[in-house]
Amino acid sequence: MEYKRFKTRQIKVGNVLIGGDAPISVQSMLFTKTRDIEGSLEQINRLYFAGANIVRLACLDMADARALKEIKAKSPLPLIVDIHFNHNLAVYCAEFIDGVRINPGNIGSKENIKEVVKACKERGIPIRIGINHGSIEKQFSDKFGYGVDAMLESAMYNIKLLEDLDFFDIKISMKTSDAQKTIEAYERLRPLCDYPFHLGVTEAGTKFHSTVKSSIALGNLLLKGIGDTMRVSMTGELEEEIRVARAILQDSGVQKSGVNIISCPTCGRIQSDLLSAIKIVEEKTKHIKEPLNISVMGCVVNALGEAKGADVAIAFGKNQGLVIRHGEVVAKLKESELVDRFLAEVEDEVKSRAVKE
């Protein structure tokens, strides 16, 4: 299946391009109190090393806003301020931040939005219209309830409001906590505008539930060419948000990066400690950003076939096994020596590619 992405307008968040032909970026949001400068910077740095492109922070009051200014000066990543209820905080933060997210359901009057637009326009920073099914404006929820129809009405109303103010650096999100409704919301809005979309399932839950919901919703949309930036929302799992997001991009075939591990589910034919080997391989290869296919198989039934499509592979047998690189056996070793040799071949493969580039 050929992947064809919907062509959107391009905006810029700090040094990250979103939309157009830019790669799909991965975002996360801190769970620190923003006034905790040291703690916030610690989480930002963790996200930076995990492979995030953009970070969002909550701003509840002026103490948060002043702290955010200091955090921004030290952050290795572009920062977006997340504003609810108090538009004055958005106006203040627009002086130094890379982007503003507003919730139309609680930001207040048109005059409030005008002030935010004016501040962002002067700085040349984008605004995300963050539609959330749980906080739709009363004028739309009274008429349509809290479903997708109300979300679409809110989105189009707020897009027009910004456009009428001659503001077009816009990004849009249409988040619900339900995978099917999220897919429907983005699909129905896509033909109605050409602004970049920020994908996400809101309040998706802990690691297990979030991974399932986000994979269904985001993977489905990405395969249809919808989406320019994304977040996998996960309760209390910063690095895992990035890891799962990157895996969705990779396994949907949209964006290749990092290691793709092929491993068998195990059965009665296994005569080795495959589970321990897989855990070691996952941990030792998670730092690799180069697109790489590796295979760790427990017996000969599918091992050699999988190895032909892998850059580096292990085929375990009884007390011994093979290390295979690009379909060629490079070593036959005792089981205790296999993983170390395999990892050495993986690192050598990464280095050899770097030299070629």
Curated annotation (Swiss-Prot):
Give the protein name, as stated in the record.
4-hydroxy-3-methylbut-2-en-1-yl diphosphate synthase (flavodoxin)
**Domain of life from the UniProt record:** Bacteria
The residues that hold [4Fe-4S] cluster are C264, C267, C299, E306
What does the protein in this record do?
Converts 2C-methyl-D-erythritol 2,4-cyclodiphosphate (ME-2,4cPP) into 1-hydroxy-2-methyl-2-(E)-butenyl 4-diphosphate.
What InterPro entries does UniProt report for this protein, alphabetically? Dihydropteroate_synth-like_sf (IPR011005), IspG_bac (IPR016425), IspG_bac-typ (IPR004588), NO2/SO3_Rdtase_4Fe4S_sf (IPR045854)
- The protein's annotated pathway: Isoprenoid biosynthesis; isopentenyl diphosphate biosynthesis via DXP pathway; isopentenyl diphosphate from 1-deoxy-D-xylulose 5-phosphate: step 5/6
Q: Using the UniProt record, name the top-level EC class of this enzyme in a single word.
A: oxidoreductase
Q: Which family does it belong to?
A: Belongs to the IspG family.
Q: Give the reaction(s) catalysed.
A: (2E)-4-hydroxy-3-methylbut-2-enyl diphosphate + oxidized [flavodoxin] + H2O + 2 H(+) = 2-C-methyl-D-erythritol 2,4-cyclic diphosphate + reduced [flavodoxin]
- Annotated organism of origin: Campylobacter jejuni (strain RM1221)
Enzyme Commission number:
1.17.7.3
Q: What is the lineage of its organism?
A: Bacteria, Pseudomonadati, Campylobacterota, Epsilonproteobacteria, Campylobacterales
